[in-house]
């Protein structure tokens, strides 16, 4: 078998194994490893592989599978039954569950939040019951008023079915009532001390003098807190736990604090706010939570919250904690995003450089991609790193059959096409599905756009193919038409006619590609594949890079 035939064979195999897209580096590495003669002229080998890969990647998956079946059956992969990923069963769930999502309204949801939302939603859909959206807004200094609307919008787009919405600041009277009950029963006290001394004593497993005072004193102090008779930091409500607990953070922990910051939703109505662990425990009981699913970072919080359940003789929900997922290459922290929006660095919460649900939606990810990824990840307790490669692969499977194909020429160069006859281009909108053709008439002696990068790779007098148009040769003053022979095995590159439109593609790394987009794509809206470039979401004549 000649090296040319071997290149084609390995490129076909590589494309077959990788969703219809061969990779030049992988094919070259394979050839050099298995065929010593291929190492003699690596430059020529790389160019030959590029030509072959361009041709194969333009075929479409169905055609590649056909070639494998007819020419290289030894490469066929035995079809396996698609592995069905399912979440584990929950105990005592057959009669329905009550579960919750509890985001803070500091901003919209990001990709990490989608895990919590989807796992809870999957179980409620499996067993029936209620999925509660509880907006935890008891920290007045960290609230974005728009988040009260953005969070439900994000969940709706993710196809998460919320059956009830609860806002914690509408339940303050409940928190105050439960606090007074705990004080009366000797489980909570009001500490009139500064934070530094409080922490120092906790680390030594020592009690504040306030701890042993009569509950009546603490009820009076709590009323003074509510009546604004303390300054911020002068008094806090503390839940009694075990001062000898091995984890200092679980020893007597603060349950209420004073804040005179104006709340974006309730204004100045309240000045005493429950800390997260207090309000969560109260709500989980009164909302009837049966099962709680959240990250391993909440393990300590769960231990803290159990004290309130035990003091009140309340039935505990079932707790599940999944491992922490590190999400690389994505901006998620709300404070960083807010500051970036204020400074003009980011255009908004949907800036494609961010990891918010809105940004990923804008780029063109499908809601089902999030669901499949998190179900596949399951509820393992071990930590892991989020795989954008797997996430993109899932999304590619969902979008590919609907994605129209178009030509986009990045960093374009306008060249004379020396053709004595009119040429006609018939390019399929999709290689595997009959969606029709994009038709262009290229008049004699027209001009077309090629990418500067492609042009730099073409040697003088080199013959190559303009995809779905004709065979041409590089000349000193442009390119010259040779023929329409579609059977020649040549390097294939995309092009755009002279009447194409200027177009930009914003990328998640912050760069912007500027080029020309073929006329029939200019008014298109939705995810499309720019051939030899990648998938792009077009929104009102603006392009947002999705993935390759």
UniProtKB/Swiss-Prot annotation:
Keywords carried by this UniProt record: Aminoacyl-tRNA synthetase, ATP-binding, Cytoplasm, Ligase, Nucleotide-binding, Protein biosynthesis
InterPro entries in the record: aa-tRNA-synth_I_CS, Gln/Glu-tRNA_Ligase, Glu-tRNA-synth_arc/euk, Glu/Gln-tRNA-synth, Glu/Gln-tRNA-synth_Ib_cat-dom, Glu/Gln-tRNA-synth_Ib_codon-bd, Rbsml_bL25/Gln-tRNA_synth_N, Ribosomal_bL25/Gln-tRNA_synth
Catalysed reactions listed for this entry: tRNA(Glu) + L-glutamate + ATP = L-glutamyl-tRNA(Glu) + AMP + diphosphate
Biological process terms in GO annotation: amide biosynthetic process; glutamyl-tRNA aminoacylation
GO MF terms held by the record: ATP binding; glutamate-tRNA ligase activity
Keyword DNA damage (UniProt): no
Motif ('HIGH' region): 103-113
Pfam families xrefs: tRNA-synt_1c, tRNA-synt_1c_C
Family indicated by similarity: Belongs to the class-I aminoacyl-tRNA synthetase family. Glutamate--tRNA ligase type 2 subfamily.
The name this protein goes by in its record: Glutamate--tRNA ligase
Organism the protein comes from: Picrophilus torridus (strain ATCC 700027 / DSM 9790 / JCM 10055 / NBRC 100828 / KAW 2/3)
Gene: gltX
